[in-house]
A protein has these predicted regions:
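Accessory nucleic-acid engagement and inter-domain coupling regions
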Residues: 1-169
Length: 169
């Protein structure tokens, strides 16, 4: 059993040595993900595993959802990405990971989020149709001419539309 545990540690920690602490480089996202998604469970099968709150928080529970809010102000449509669990200044990077069909996205704070069941389709469609870039998305509020409201009306669920937007359309 002990030899199996040593083999598991060698697989999970590429810089492992018998005289030093097992480590994973911070830049090695694939190995970190392997440890978070499968490695801890494998280690638990051969012994007790203790972890810190910081380690346990490296994997965001669930999948991210980013909805789109629409409102009208001075004949301009305001588009606001609404994401409770995603930092607003990282929505663009999250969308880029989603578009590249990555299984996971890593936020600037080091937290990973599973994109397998991410609900980003609505935002992706609007960003594509309006040819918006990551910086515009990260700003939190995008303003476009009012005549484009009719295009957006069909793409966004009614619960994302303000009363001013519904009245305008």
């Amino acid at each position: 059993r002990e030899s199996f545990a040593v083999q598991v540690v060698r697989q999970l920690f590429p810089t492992w040595s018998s005289i030093d602490v097992a480590r994973i480089r911070e830049e090695d996202e694939q190995t970190i993900l392997l440890l978070l998604t499968e490695g801890v469970d494998i280690l638990r099968s051969v012994g007790q595993v203790f972890s810190t709150a910081a380690f346990d928080g490296m994997m965001m529970p669930g999948s991210p959802t980013v909805k789109v809010g629409l409102s009208i102000d001075s004949n301009l449509v305001e588009i606001s990405p609404i994401a409770d669990e995603v930092p607003m200044n990282e929505v663009g990077a999250l969308l880029n990971s989603y578009r590249r069909n990555r299984r996971y996205h890593r936020f600037k704070d080091g937290t990973f989020v599973d994109l397998k069941n991410a609900d980003l389709h609505e935002l992706d469609q609007i960003v594509t149709d309006l040819d918006l870039d990551e910086q515009q998305i990260d700003s939190g509020r995008i303003t476009i001419p009012g005549y484009r409201a009719f295009l957006l009306d069909a793409q966004v669920d009614d619960d994302g539309k303000s009363e001013s937007f519904v009245d305008y359309v």
